[in-house]
């Protein structure tokens, strides 16, 4: 269902200011004004009637419609597959109405969650409580300067070594394992980006392929461009991955002890 959709608290203003004469957007324009009329109870509301609460509610309204239409179509024509949403960006984790409607329509929410060494438990709890659904992290990574790559591209933070990348992986995923609603994660990505930032087009099997400029010259992979594993990173990943279920049992037992002590 698309990927990394935009989040804008001024979405309502943007729709209201569309041109009603524009064939591409006149339905969106009319829908926004009809919504505002219904929400304010006024026949001729103005932008002065818009509150912060209405701005948040309209964002939820848009995503409710998007997820309803998308999930309904997928379930009609592809009923045997889960609906995983749109890989929400980090900014969505504090949008309660988006989370609630996503949880209503999706089988599992997905997030590309950057900007945290480990995600604070209160943020994970906020997503869990509002979505009331399982979710997974579909992108996260750091880049190591010891790779020899420039590392100026991409959303992941920069660290000094591959061991520090491994430390980040362990810290980040241990926090995820503490959260009962998290069902998995996906490191971005398997192989490093091309080290040549000047290459925008590259011939692959006789076909000219365009490369996104965010996908060059960065140590995102668990293997290099020559398919050599970053051993320190891989070993740290393996240590966590082989013990996932034991770690879940540990955190569950810890939660049970805390709950018993509070009774």
Where are these regions (language model features)?
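Substrate-binding cleft/loops of secretory-pathway carbohydrate-active enzymes
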Residues: 83-123, 191-202, 214-217
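Aromatic-rich peripheral "rim/lid" segments of glycoside hydrolase catalytic domains that contact
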Residues: 188-263
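Conserved, mostly hydrophobic/aromatic
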Residues: 74, 109, 139, 185
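Polysaccharide-binding and catalytic clefts of secreted carbohydrate-active enzymes
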Residues: 1-97
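Generic structural signal for well-ordered alpha-helices
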Residues: 64-72, 121-125, 169, 173
């Amino acid at each position: 269902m698309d990927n990394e959709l935009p989040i804008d608290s001024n979405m309502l203003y943007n729709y209201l200011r569309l041109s009603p004469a524009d064939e591409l957007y006149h339905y969106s324009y009319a829908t926004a004004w009809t919504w505002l009329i219904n929400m304010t109870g006024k026949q001729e509301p103005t932008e002065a009637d818009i509150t912060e609460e209405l701005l948040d509610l309209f964002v939820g309204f848009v995503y409710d419609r998007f997820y309803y239409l998308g999930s309904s179509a997928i379930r009609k024509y592809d009923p045997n597959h889960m609906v995983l949403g749109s890989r929400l960006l980090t900014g969505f984790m504090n949008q309660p109405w988006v989370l609630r409607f996503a949880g209503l329509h999706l089988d599992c929410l997905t997030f590309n969650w950057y900007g945290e060494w480990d995600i604070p438990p209160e943020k994970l709890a906020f997503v869990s409580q509002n979505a009331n659904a399982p979710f997974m992290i579909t992108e996260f990574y750091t880049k190591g300067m010891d790779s020899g790559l420039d590392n100026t591209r991409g959303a992941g933070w920069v660290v000094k070594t591959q061991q520090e990348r491994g430390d980040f992986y362990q810290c980040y995923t241990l926090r995820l394992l503490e959260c009962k609603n998290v069902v998995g994660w996906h490191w971005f990505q398997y192989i490093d980006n091309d080290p040549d930032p000047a290459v925008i087009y590259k011939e692959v099997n006789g076909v000219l392929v365009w490369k996104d400029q965010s996908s060059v010259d960065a140590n995102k992979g668990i293997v290099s461009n020559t398919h050599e594993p970053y051993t320190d990173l891989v070993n740290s990943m393996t240590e966590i991955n082989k013990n996932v279920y034991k770690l879940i049992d540990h955190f569950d037992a810890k939660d049970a002890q805390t709950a018993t002590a509070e009774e």
